[in-house]
């Protein structure tokens, strides 16, 4: 899992990486972006120092890569953090992780 995160970090830092937009930004108007509505079966998470909001499928939280990210979150922010779920990860790396999970690539790398 750590190996996958390291590999994705290197890819995110490369100049060939094209920026992926978060699911919360795809195909939505400005008015819709500010809503706090979350579809059933999904969880909002805030990523990185920028606190960029992502809406991810709750089933992903059990994936080993996400478990590793959640452990990092617990180490950095503690288990008693209130309010939002924060992930201490660069936004570009997180977007790359989501894309890899979506394409089914994360299982092959771990």
Swiss-Prot record:
InterPro entries: SAUR_fam. Plays a role in the regulation of cell expansion, root meristem patterning and auxin transport. It is found in: Cytoplasm. One of its GO terms (cellular component) is cytoplasm. The lineage of its organism: Eukaryota, Viridiplantae, Streptophyta, Embryophyta, Tracheophyta. Pfam families: Auxin_inducible. Belongs to the ARG7 family. Highly expressed in the steles of roots and hypocotyls. It comes from the Eukaryota. This is Auxin-responsive protein SAUR71. GO terms for biological process: auxin-activated signaling pathway. Keywords: Auxin signaling pathway, Cytoplasm, Developmental protein, Growth regulation. The keyword Cytoplasm applies.
